[in-house]
A protein has these predicted regions:
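Active-site-proximal loop/turn and secondary-structure-junction residues that shape catalytic pockets
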Residues: 9-11, 37-39, 65-68, 105-109, ...
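Active-site-adjacent beta->alpha loops and helix N-cap segments on the catalytic face
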Residues: 41-51
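Residue-level detector of anion-binding/catalytic polar loops
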Residues: 31-32, 58, 99, 142, ...
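Histidine-acidic metal/acid-base catalytic patches
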Residues: 1-7, 11, 15-26, 97-99, ...
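Conserved beta-strand positions in the central sheet of alpha/beta enzyme cores
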Residues: 34, 61-63, 102, 144, ...
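Active-site acidic/histidine proton-transfer and metal-coordination neighborhood
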Residues: 54, 76-175, 257-265
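Catalytic domains of carbohydrate-active enzymes, especially glycoside hydrolases
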Residues: 19-39, 89, 96-97
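A short acidic, helix-capping loop that chelates divalent metal ions and anchors anionic groups
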Residues: 68-73, 109-115, 151-152, 185-186, ...
Length: 279
């Protein structure tokens, strides 16, 4: 297993000014960092590459749909722009040296049209990711599509649907990011959710039920790690939380209070817990 932490605890816009964070993160016991990428053209590629080289860490990339772009829009022009944005981000992911780009890469987070998704929207997402599959393979990058809870998206919520989506996409470079925070809301049993997505599981977010420190809430971690071991997953375990001092991110994630004594305590206490659970 490799242990990662999303830099959204500290910043939503990584640049060279954040490089001093990386040695501290390394010293806390992490193998890598996860960095948010909005648009590849604006990403601090050189700064991140330097920070990783200096610390011996690796990275993964997380991404979301920006500028109201969507793979499920009924407007073909919007879908085409969304595919091009993802192509750009995939290429930049490879340029950084990362192998994973993960996130709810289908529709904007928080877009809730007040109805169920349609069969046509589903087909659009499948078609778009089938277009992107060869581009991912060319760049030796894997996309891990993330189901979110029902309060953040209407399109993809459950392990069953995520596995079916990847079955229909049918490309080995397209899989699933499964996050315990969202699974705690949407799954009857989180561990069984991991078993359901096993054949497509590419990335894991180890997050507590309140997005606080792993091990401090009611996620049944023993069962989760038993399932992860059972299915043979040996990739990243990444802590994702959000600093309350980042208003735009805190508002989007509905973080209205402190989740720990300090935002970074979620990460530094959390990784000790994860290492204990996986020892």
């Amino acid at each position: 297993m490799r242990f990662g932490v999303n830099l959204l605890i500290w910043t939503a816009n990584f640049d060279a000014s954040h490089l001093p964070l990386l040695p501290r993160i390394r010293a806390a016991g992490f193998d890598g960092v996860e960095v948010l990428m909005y648009k590849g053209r604006d990403f601090a590629v050189d700064a991140l590459r330097k920070g990783l080289a200096d610390t011996g860490m690796e990275c993964t990339i997380c991404s979301v749909m920006v500028d109201d772009l969507s793979l499920v829009s009924d407007d073909a022009a919007i879908r085409a722009k969304a595919v091009e944005q993802l192509r750009e981000n995939i290429a930049t992911t490879a340029e950084v040296g990362a192998k994973i780009i993960a996130g709810p890469m289908y529709a904007p987070v928080g877009y809730l049209p007040g109805r169920r998704r349609t069969a046509e929207e589903w087909k659009r997402a499948v078609d778009c990711w089938q277009q992107l599959g060869p581009w991912l393979a060319q760049h030796e990058v894997t996309a891990a599509i993330e189901p979110l809870n029902r309060f953040e998206t209407y399109f993809l919520n459950t392990a069953v649907d995520a596995a079916r989506l990847c079955d229909e996409i049918g490309h080995s470079n397209v899989g699933i990011l499964f996050d315990t925070f969202h699974a705690n809301i949407e799954e009857k049993n989180i561990a069984d959710g991991y078993r359901t997505v096993a054949r497509h599981l590419k990335h894991v977010h180890t997050c507590e039920n309140d997005r606080g420190t792993p091990g401090s809430g009611h996620v049944e971690w023993m069962q989760v790690f038993e399932a992860i071991k059972e299915i043979g997953y040996d990739g990243w375990l990444t802590i994702e939380s959000f600093g309350s001092n980042l208003p735009e991110i805190a508002a989007a994630a509905a973080i209205w209070r402190d989740l720990a004594s300090t935002p970074e305590a979620v990460a530094f206490d959390g990784v000790r817990f994860l290492k204990k659970m996986t020892a």
